[in-house]
Amino acid sequence: GCCSPWNCIQLRACPCCPN
């Protein structure tokens, strides 16, 4: 999902991703 570490690298706009 959006909050997975890999997707947080790719999709930094996700609300649960840092930065």
Curated annotation (Swiss-Prot):
One of its GO terms (cellular component) is extracellular region. Its main location: secreted. It comes from the Eukaryota. This is Conotoxin Reg12f. Expressed by the venom duct. Coiled coil: none annotated. Disulfide bonds join 2-16, 3-14, 8-17. Belongs to the conotoxin M superfamily. The keyword Secreted applies. The modification 4-hydroxyproline is found at residues 5, 15, 18. Keywords: Disulfide bond, Hydroxylation, Secreted, Toxin. GO terms for molecular function: toxin activity. The cysteine framework is III (CC-C-C-CC).
